[in-house]
Amino acid sequence: MELPYTEPLTVREAGPRIVPEPPRRGEPGGEPCGLCSGGATKAVWGNEHFTLHPPVGGSMPGHVWLASREHVDSFCDLSPEAAQAFGPLVARIERAILAEGDVGRVHVSRWGDGGAHFHVWFMPRPLGMLEAKNFMLPLWEDVLPNVSDEELREAAERIAARL
């Protein structure tokens, strides 16, 4: 794995800690939740617990995100029914992304720092793109040239059709 930058890079010091942290979207005092207010990209698939969405802007067709229908923050906040449905659904989404072809691995990530509505990201690592292994994939996804939002949505719709 390699950074998508050339030398020389310098390590900078971390800034001061900000406590309490500022509110995120969907938290009291923060901006409205994008999902609950209808500001998120239109879902390509959904069931009683989750919806699947394409990203806006991105370089890797097949990159999708899964959100809970209920406004909760984390895995531990999901209803028992949604938590039970989550694992099998993740496996189905991974298989659907792998079926796109030319995919080495599917990375599943949850950061949660931007918004307080539970969502996870599925990122396909292109087959043979070994410099993007592990935690490097999001960095490479960010610096590679974007494809059109239409191409991202079409890939997401193909993935949804396999679910």
Predicted feature descriptions by range:
Residues 118-125:
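A short beta-strand motif that forms the metal-chelation/ATP-contact edge
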Residues 48-50, 104, 116:
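Short beta-strand or tight-loop elements
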Residues 64-87, 140-148:
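Short histidine-centered catalytic/ligand-binding loop motif
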Residues 55-57, 69-71, 111:
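Histidine- and/or cysteine-centered catalytic micro-motif in compact active-site loops
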Residues 1-66:
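Active-site microenvironments that recognize anionic phosphate/pyrophosphate groups
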Residues 101-114:
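A short glycine-rich, hydrophobically flanked beta-strand micro-motif that places a catalytic Asp/Glu
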Residues 1-19, 126-163:
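C-terminal helix-cap and adjacent tail motif
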Residues 79-104:
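A long amphipathic alpha-helix within ATP-dependent nucleotide-binding catalytic cores
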